Amino acid sequence: MTQTEIQQGIKILFDKLTIAENNRLIYKQLTELCGIDKQFECVLKKSICFWKLTINSLCFSIITELAKIYDEQKDAFGIKKLINISSQNGDWFSKWYNENGVLHKDFIKQLEEKYNSIEKKREKLKEIRDAELAHNDRKNILNTQSIYDGFTWGDIEDLIETANEIINRISISLTGIEYIIQLRNYDDIHCLIKNAYKGMHNIDKLNN
């Protein structure tokens, strides 16, 4: 692969990471609202099917986008391939010799160690993508602790943070570009819940 192709691959990986992180934050906001906001509880009880579809859709998106990022299949461009190609092309990363005093082999080794440190979480992610999501109708919605058995939201956060670190360290050393996750539509959920609550309140007043 050329440097241009690697840069394009990095951008695609980060776009997937942004989707996963934004959906995780929206899911987190929903779970927090469920615990403290009576308005949300009221809306949830009135439209349980809608919210179950919404929550399952968020979970599915988070899992699938992360699974693409950590895909190690030969024809996939994931974090592992990004590390391997970077390892094979040390001359692309001259900045690490001149500016930071870190040898290329040490820089790549650090990223490989970081990647290997989350092996069990990566394996569980793949397992869920391949098997569990086909039966997500059986799962409880708005679970603040875990998504599926043995796989927690803390694991999701760790996978996102690790991917973010590896992608950006390679991108910065290759091009000087740092990618920042931009929050998208994060406030929409509050507006949706408040408007739904107002609508139900007005209907109740009319019925009475």
Protein language model annotation of sequence segments:
Residues 1-121, 146-208:
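Amphipathic alpha-helical interface segments
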